[in-house]
Amino acid sequence: MDRRSRAMADSVLSLNKLDVGFPGMTVVRDLNLDVADGAFVSLLGPSGSGKSSVLRTIAGLLPALGGRVLLEGQDITALPPERRNVGIVFQNYALFPTMSAFENIAFALRVAKKSKAEVERRVGEVAEMAGISDQLDKKPANMSGGQQQRVAIARALVTGSRVLLFDEPLSNLDAKVRAAMRKEIKRLQSELGFTAIFVTHDQEDALTMSDLIVVLNHGKIEQIGDGRTLYRKPATPFICEFIGVSNELAPPLAARLLGYDVKGRSFLRHEDVLLGAVAGVPARVNHVEFLGAHSRVDLEVEGHALSAMLIGDQLPEPGSTVSLGIRPGAAHVFQEVTG
């Protein structure tokens, strides 16, 4: 058994050479991904990268153009959504406004013609797990955003789904509520033990919640890894630009700062630019922007723009000259391959 086959055998969900899209238009081609049981995996990418199309193909809402979707080793590629045993939590939770929380959670069970006793038992079980047993008589309008989120997750779990798909459920929330909801979803996932596939365009969502992040760009995987790996060891220039905030160094400036010629592209994160360095490069301070926990300093170095992130109140004055250096080993260099 080769490495890929072993990974698929050990995974609760596998995408094998999956082609995703619409008739006449392939959005994602030849996607391979293995998701471990109980993992929290984010599909991260800009608009149009194909992440939501992948999620809908896993759910069966969008037919696969090629390849296979395997759930616990079983090929579910051709199965309709209701037979896939995966739950989905939509962007706006998609709760029925005229139904109580109990009725929302029970809906799929009643469609499946489960007995009244079984409906009450299973709804009661997932409601207790999700911490909403005391909310079951309420309608969505009378519940907080966090309570609605729990109802949506309970509804997705009540049919026995072990894999939950989240289609950008935080995208319409303000920053403070969004941060609270991130913690809530991650807590529920950890406590209930389900496998989560979470689609987002927001890197903060992915970095704070995920065991594994799959970065998509123009229908292809740029890199797969945990947040720390993506941030500190980016595999491509796109990752440098998309994850965190980086300076792209012009070749002459890269040569001056790194001490060797760069035939390609090089990047330096704002926090890795050091001011006040011994034997550094002279830099002019153009602008200082206070951002609360840190400040951004825009610099000009030998005609090239560069930005630094500083923490604390000791900030240079605009128009002054500072000595600039870089954190050793912090630059990300992608040399051109010649051949």
UniProtKB/Swiss-Prot annotation:
Keywords: ATP-binding, Cell inner membrane, Cell membrane, Membrane, Nucleotide-binding, Plasmid, Transport. It comes from the Bacteria. It is a peripheral membrane protein. SUPFAM superfamilies: MOP-like, P-loop containing nucleoside triphosphate hydrolases. InterPro entries: AAA+_ATPase, ABC_transporter-like_ATP-bd, ABC_transporter-like_CS, ABC_transpr_FbpC, ABC_transpr_MalK/UgpC-like, Mo/tungstate-bd_C_term_dom, P-loop_NTPase, Transp-assoc_OB_typ2. Its main location: membrane. GO terms for molecular function: ABC-type ferric iron transporter activity; ATP binding; ATP hydrolysis activity. It is found in: Cell inner membrane. Residues 13-243 form the ABC transporter domain. ATP binds at residues 45-52. One of its GO terms (cellular component) is ATP-binding cassette (ABC) transporter complex, substrate-binding subunit-containing. It holds the Pfam family ABC_tran. CDD domains: ABC_Carb_Solutes_like (cd03259). Probably part of a binding-protein-dependent transport system y4fNOP. Probably responsible for energy coupling to the transport system. Belongs to the ABC transporter superfamily. This is Uncharacterized ABC transporter ATP-binding protein y4fO. It comes from Sinorhizobium fredii (strain NBRC 101917 / NGR234).
